[in-house]
Design a protein with these regions (language model features):
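Single conserved hydrophobic/aromatic residue that forms the stacking wall/gate
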Residues: 1-6, 10
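A short, aromatic/hydrophobic, helix- or strand-capping loop or linear motif
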Residues: 11-12, 78-83, 103-109
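Short beta->alpha transition motifs characteristic of CBS
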Residues: 14, 21, 32-38, 120-123, ...
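A short helix-loop-beta-strand connector motif used in the catalytic cores of GNAT acetyltransferases and
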Residues: 16-18, 94-108
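An amphipathic alpha-helix signature
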Residues: 18, 60-67, 87, 91, ...
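Short, glycine-anchored, charge-dense loop/turn motifs used at functional sites
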Residues: 25-30
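Acyl-donor (CoA/ACP) binding surface of acyl/acetyltransferases
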Residues: 43-74, 104, 108-220
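Conserved GNAT-fold acetyl-CoA-binding loop/helix
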Residues: 74-96
Length: 220
């Protein structure tokens, strides 16, 4: 028999999809795991494995783990979004952003599958080049200083350049977010300047963005 699992293309049918399908030698389906559409990751989201991490699509089952991370003001205030107040708020973020958004992953530890952060690549809104992307990420404060984010960023850069065919990947962070700056510099990003008054946050504060970029031929 042959099986198709999380790393394969999901087969959609009706209001959901087959997450895992077992076929007999003639290709007939003999066993499957079916999930509703809201739990289905967008087409093209692949599982990425590193030495210590598994980057996988988000599901609604991640609601509590996302809330546990994102209720921390030290995380949200460094990333530009309001700290989560309720599980319902975290679920809404999952349903409207993390789950439907292509090339967005939950960062989980291999050792215990604990969700510790998020990472993704989006089209760069500041550049007209369709082969330019923008990377964004956050990490649970309890996991800071362990090298997890550098490991995840390295894997997603490889995916962006070599799987998506991007020629440039950018990143922005607040001037006070020194940890994010160190990650980008470690990965070989070049600092290209300050975009002044770039963002009005949820609490009506105006922030500058430090802007970085990395071209494919400079990937470490």
């Amino acid at each position: 028999v042959r099986s198709r699992g999380l790393g394969d293309v999901y087969k959609r049918q009706g209001d959901g999809y087959f997450e895992s399908v077992i076929l007999d030698p003639d290709g007939n389906r003999i066993e499957c795991v079916y999930k509703k559409e809201q739990e289905c990751p967008p087409e093209g989201n692949h599982v990425i494995e590193t030495e210590r991490l598994i980057l996988r699509p988000f599901t609604e089952n991640d609601t509590e783990a996302v809330f546990n991370c994102c209720q921390n003001p030290n995380l949200g205030n460094n990333a530009g979004w309001k700290p989560h107040d309720t599980l319902e708020e975290s679920l809404k973020i999952l349903q409207t952003i993390f789950i439907p958004q292509k090339d967005t992953w939950a960062i989980t530890r291999k050792e215990d599958r604990l969700l510790i952060g998020a990472i993704g690549i989006l089209p760069d809104p500041k550049r007209e080049n369709s082969n330019a992307g923008m990377i964004g990420y956050w990490l649970d404060e309890a996991q800071w200083g362990k090298g997890y984010m550098s490991e995840a960023v390295c894997a997603v850069l490889d995916y962006g350049f070599n799987k998506l065919g991007l020629t440039l990947i950018s990143a922005n962070c607040y001037p006070q977010n020194k940890r994010s700056q160190r990650v980008l510099e470690k990965m070989g990003f070049t600092y290209e300047g300050i975009l002044h008054q770039a963002e009005v946050s949820y609490d009506d504060k105006i922030y500058d963005h430090l802007c970085y970029y990395l071209e494919k031929n400079n990937l470490k």
